Amino acid sequence: MAGLSNSQIPDGEFTAVVYRLIRDSRYSEAVQLLSAELQRSSRSRAGLSLLAYCYYRLQEFELAAECYEQLSQMHPELEQYRLYQAQALYKACLYPEATRVAFLLDNPTFYSRVLRLQAAIKYSEGDLPGARSLVEQLLSGEAGEDSGGENDPDGLVNMGCLLYKEGHYEAACSKFFAALQASGYQPDVSYNLALACYSNRHYAPALKHIANIIERGIRQHPELGVGMTTEGIDVRSVGNTVVLHQTALVEAFNLKAAIEYQLRNYEAAQEALTDMPPRAEEELDPVTLHNQALMNMDAKPTEGFEKLQFLLQQNPFPPETFGNLLLLYCKYEYFDLAADVLAENAHLTYKFLTPYLYDFLDAMITCQTAPEEAFIKLDGLAGMLTEQLRRLTKQVQEARHNRDDEVVIKAVNEYDETLEKYIPVLMAQAKIYWNLENYPMVEKIFRKSVEFCNDHDVWKLNVAHVLFMQENKYKEAIGFYEPIVKKNYDNILSVSAIVLANLCVSYIMTSQNEEAEELMRKIEKEEEQLSYGDPDKKIYHLCIVNLVIGTLYCAKGNYDFGISRVIKSLEPYHKKLGTDTWYYAKRCFLSLLENMSKHTIMLRDSVIQECVQFLEHCEIFGRNIPAVIEQPLEEERMHIGKNTVTYESRQLKALIYEIIGWNM
């Protein structure tokens, strides 16, 4: 509905209309009317005051600050305008400007409010000692009657926030809990408590507090449309309203997503983000945008990079943004971009990167041009972390001997955190030799770390892979692959298809064909059950297992059986043909064509005919399937008509005809 214009409002009704709009939270319309009115009467105190209020409610804090600045200049005797200006500047994250305005306030009436504001500014700037000094001043009662005391809910929350920033999560939890008991349920305080529990790795109580926030938000504000997007219901944006902010629903869903992500429940993490009240992308807060980028990175990497790059230009941005963008550049092997971002943002390096993360990124970037130097850097980092792990192991043993449960829990948590730092360093070292196909050296690196990593799933998986690649250690590879598969046997499709395929090949190569067949029957059974619920869903596990087995026979020179296995594995084509499965299939065909062109093998006409028919089927079903998933930030894109399974299958068919001398 179009907004009212000033000319449509009857004489004498302007003020009433504006107040009605504000009462109904229609602040944008009120801003239009007030702005037009102020063009005619620019020194209207009432008009400017209402406009500032509307801007503040719309979270246009800089514009609100400008209005309050005008008011304080027009009425210097009314110091509350200067206070409101300082508060608006603080909300706009303009901390130096907010501090400057706050220092101009010397009215005793506002003393405690100014102290609170100054403490909040110092806290946001990272000056924790300065913030603590001001908070303690408030708690002592020095700031007047309304400054509160030790049991004042605001004071408890402030102390809780300081303790949280200082890393004292247990003590912070106690303060937030006491604040809730003193004031009753407050969504923002409940969120603070959940966040402190999360940071202390107490995920169950954190999720309990989050569930309470969400449940109350849904019950009290059904109009916010919680869960609608996940259910596929098309709903309009609820906007960034004050009500939404007061419910702490956005913060709660973001924290829930972070916990599920930490627990490797990636689907649940994505669902938490889509469950939150719907907003347009341009309305999203920085934390939600950051989390969306991370959790959809596998499916939409280009969008993910764009969002993180955008956030880096904002003030403020989530502190994790800088490190995560650099790590993702390294993951996707954009080392030059990572180096450029580090060089261009030296001021952010010291603020947002720990010494460990900086050294790790430096080594990863060095890998591209000087792998030997990178290995030495990583080795130094690994040595430092192994020393920490040994020290923490000793601490845990001593604490258990002394039956000090609190120290045990703290040391175990610290050990787990250090191990999570050590694993990426170890894998980066191993990858240097993996890229050189020096698998015995990779195995040697892993064996050196067995003391700390023998229970870590990532380590076990990579040990299995390196044993498998050596082709004479299939039995040892089974010893590492089997526990991974058995651990998830009741949900076998949650296991990576390549793990299942490598285990099957290892069984075959060690003459354990019955075990291989049993595993394949189990995969087939689960795929059938899944297809009953969703007949159109593409499931590739059994297909990839058969493709890898077919590849094995082709590698051994048995192309008749190997190629037939590859062809059968992709039936039916509409469900089995995809970018990954085509990758395995075309490798076998290229190997076959290479050997045919060298006249090292001869194929029966029936097999050649089978190959041609297979490629014709791929041509039909592969029109909309990319042959290659391009890198997300690739400047020169492949021709859209060439990057399809259809195009590549035609090329392979033409090569077959050329080699055997058939006329097309």
Curated annotation (Swiss-Prot):
One cellular-component annotation, GO: intraciliary transport particle B
Coiled coil: 507-534
TPR repeats: 11-44, 45-78, 153-186, 188-220, 395-423, 424-456, 458-491, 543-576
Entry keyword set: Cell projection, Cilium, Cilium biogenesis/degradation, Coiled coil, Repeat, TPR repeat
Protein family according to the UniProt entry: Belongs to the TTC30/dfy-1/fleer family.
Domain of life the protein comes from: Eukaryota
Protein's UniProt name: Intraflagellar transport protein 70A2
Assembly, per entry: Interacts wit the IFT B complex component IFT52.
SMART domains with a match to the protein in the record: TPR
Function: Required for polyglutamylation of axonemal tubulin. Plays a role in anterograde intraflagellar transport (IFT), the process by which cilia precursors are transported from the base of the cilium to the site of their incorporation at the tip.
GO biological processes: intraciliary transport
Gene3D superfamilies assigned: Tetratricopeptide repeat domain
Subcellular location: Cell projection, Cilium
